[in-house]
Amino acid sequence: MKLYQWQIFRWFFETLNCSLGRAYKASKRIQYIKKDYSFYKNTILFSKGSWQAINLYTNTELRNTLFIIYWSLLEYRISLCFLNLLRKIESIQFKKLSVISFILNLHSSLSHVNKQLQILSKVLFDRFYFYLWKNMYFSLLLHNSLSRFVKESIEESEQSGFNNENKKDFQDETYFVLNESLEKDFSRIREMNRKLAWIEVTLNDLNTWKSYYLFFPFLSEMKNTPQNESSFKLKNFEITTPAYDSTGFIPRSISRTLSRFQIELMGQSSSLVLQEFRSAKYQALASIQYIGCLIFLPWIISRSLKEWFLEPWIKFWWDTYQSQISLNSFQEERASEGLQEVEEPLWLDKLVSNFLKNQSQDLNIEIYGETIQLIRMYNENSIQTILHLLTGMICFTTLGALFILGKKRLSVLNSWIQESFYSLSDTMKAFAILLLTDLCIGFHSPHGWEVVIGSSLEHLGFAHNKHIISCFVSTFPVILDTVSKYWIFRHLNRISPSIVATYHTMNE
């Protein structure tokens, strides 16, 4: 085997070991995640929203760990396939590139090496037999050819004279190098088999654990009666608890104070602080990631589709199959007004300069050139209007898909926003509510709504209709005002009456 081929072979073998070691470490992390979850479940009292955050945090950590395991095993499998391919290529040229042939040619002056060559052939066969363990038929053929080749080489070597000193040096050098390398490889192979068995057992145990234990604490307390077993199915179970603490007859502050007092008596305050920190960290990271997806992902998808697919296709379709340059009468009116604005100054300049009789042909050429430029400009505006309409539809479709597919993330975001809002002081809460309501439904908000609606209509290629804009401005802010007042009266007044009092004081 050539040196570079052996180096490639060793590199793939090291890749096998590294990828399997990475998967093994990730499987060890699964055990720690399960222990942490069991510890929090048995020692800490949570609300329903906190339990859902813990479950989502545990599921996220498990998904990340499983991704590392499966990716490492895929890398392991690919490296193993390349090793098999290299072994097949090497087996074709085995006689030409045999290590035994290289050694015999190098030590052609040695004699009486029958025993040493037998040891060498056995060691080499053991190595190649392991590398070709999946192809037993090919391994037998390889062993027969190797034995036959070694036997012929021994018979040829016995015909020449060798001394005992060279014989002993060759035996010691060959046996030491090959024996040390093989023992190291075999130890690695045994270690890899042990790691594969551990990973398989861990994954099977994880599936069982997720099916029976990764739910809210009240599920583990259900009795294993036949009635409960028939009526409760873990596979069809869905978590429907809200992401925040619902208000009831007893205020949340009292229930939280009692829970914390009980935890202090049990001596578990340190674990509570650690768990609350992890839960808050997960909620913040998950909420920020989801907000980033809601903001940037629709824009990136629509922008990419517009640049790579929509814009070239729409330009080709519009310029080839459409004879008109405008989409509706509003754009036609704007095009005619633009043409009049171009023609009138030109005619006026020529009349004032008294060159109308002598240069009427030049005037027509200038008007024709300006008209062509206007046609190109409004043709491009029509194409851009179609693109804006399609990209807007893509953005709304992407947002809808994110809302539908990310219900759990949305519930965590809702819980995080409410917790952040409730952690503010009463003055800051009232200020935030007052600022938001004044921006949307305040005294100066109708003019802002008119600008927003008019710009949106022009962006989509529609006419600036004052009646539609006035109707929208007169109804939509009123609906927002009604919803905000109902929320303040129904929800905020029950949670914190001091916020409502501060809000009314600041509003007056």
UniProtKB/Swiss-Prot annotation:
Keywords annotated in UniProt: Antiport, Chloroplast, Hydrogen ion transport, Ion transport, Membrane, Plastid, Plastid inner membrane, Potassium, Potassium transport, Transmembrane, Transmembrane helix, Transport
A Gene Ontology biological process term: potassium ion transport
Reactions catalysed, as given in the entry: K(+)(in) + H(+)(out) = K(+)(out) + H(+)(in)
GO cellular component: chloroplast inner membrane
Bilayer disposition of the protein: Multi-pass membrane protein
Major site of localization recorded for this protein: plastid
Transmembrane residue ranges: 66-86, 282-302, 386-406, 433-453, 468-488
Membrane recorded as keyword: yes
Compartment list: Plastid, Chloroplast inner membrane
Pfam families in alphabetical order: CemA
Classification via InterPro entries: CemA
GO molecular function, one term: antiporter activity
Family to which this protein belongs: Belongs to the CemA family.
Protein name, as recorded: Potassium/proton antiporter CemA
Organism in which the protein naturally occurs: Anthoceros angustus (Hornwort)
Gene designation: cemA
